[in-house]
């Protein structure tokens, strides 16, 4: 089996984190985002994975070499000299994707969910047509492009309606697909949108089906969604009874859904949770309050600080009695002074915050 991950470019929506590392290598729940996807593909029997990239492929090649060996798979990089949108990368990787007649998976690198690849493969084979897209239900379909099925058919897609004014359905494209190799004949090697060009042509030929995703789903490509996706992921681990989570019986765990790397150090009288991930070598002082936040490797939170709805970048330090909230994102090696208040915004790498930030801003 084969799979292609649409990695894309600069990851601007997730800055300042992506100023330091490519977006797929940013840790989500203490594991690089792309590793979540690779593990799910491997579990479904995929042995050949293509990463479609146009930014810093050499960094990812070096990092992912160990996973090739660990999983016994082949990872190839398909490097775009110009951005090819969402369909062009499939054509660029045709040599690999069409090396045999088996279908192949495609997924967007920003998506985190309970990846259903094994069930998706079985469903795709059962209907025998060219493509299947995974769809997920949303509460406000008017914000999205909605999938509409043919009358009397539960999976065959009739059309897509972009941001419908009237209710026509509540299922949207989840950014996970499986295709037969024949789809490559529909795509030219140029910037091409799979959603706007390829899918409508497949629908016209009655060749595109949908598959309902069970469980959580989130595009975590920007900070507020990264935090929301973390909450959903941790809740999913709780429902599964995962041993990865820190035991709720620990005296510092408050509300559950807490994931702490074993190398992290936690001070006295802390209240951590719900929905917190703490990475390797993080140091938490005494009396610290953490809620709905992500602390990346090597960061430090000093005594009695309050951190909520915040992503703390690698090797950053939050001072004593500081308070951060309202979707604050600290880049790599940021220092927040003692007793400082930060009410949202982004702080670029290697900066020091010495005055309160009352209005969300970009600190350069």
UniProtKB/Swiss-Prot annotation:
Keywords in alphabetical order, please: Cell cycle, Cytoplasm, GTP-binding, Nucleotide-binding, Nucleotidyltransferase, Transferase
- Extract the InterPro entries matched here: GMPPB_C (IPR056729), GMPPB_N (IPR045233), Hexapep_transf_CS (IPR018357), Mannose-1P_guanyltransferase (IPR050486), NTP_transferase_dom (IPR005835), Nucleotide-diphossugar_trans (IPR029044)
Any one GO CC term of the record:
cytoplasm
* Reaction equations catalysed: alpha-D-mannose 1-phosphate + GTP + H(+) = GDP-alpha-D-mannose + diphosphate
What one GO molecular function would you report for this record?
Answer: mannose-1-phosphate guanylyltransferase (GTP) activity
**Which processes are annotated in GO (biological process)?**
GDP-mannose biosynthetic process
Q: Where in the cell is it found?
A: Cytoplasm
Enzyme Commission no? 2.7.7.13
Q: In what pathway does it function?
A: Nucleotide-sugar biosynthesis; GDP-alpha-D-mannose biosynthesis; GDP-alpha-D-mannose from alpha-D-mannose 1-phosphate (GTP route): step 1/1
Its job: Involved in cell wall synthesis where it is required for glycosylation. Involved in cell cycle progression through cell-size checkpoint.
Family in the record: Belongs to the transferase hexapeptide repeat family.
- Record's protein name: Mannose-1-phosphate guanyltransferase
**Protein species of origin:** Gibberella zeae (strain ATCC MYA-4620 / CBS 123657 / FGSC 9075 / NRRL 31084 / PH-1)
* The organism's taxonomic lineage, starting at the top: Eukaryota, Fungi, Dikarya, Ascomycota, Pezizomycotina
Gene this chain is encoded by: MPG1
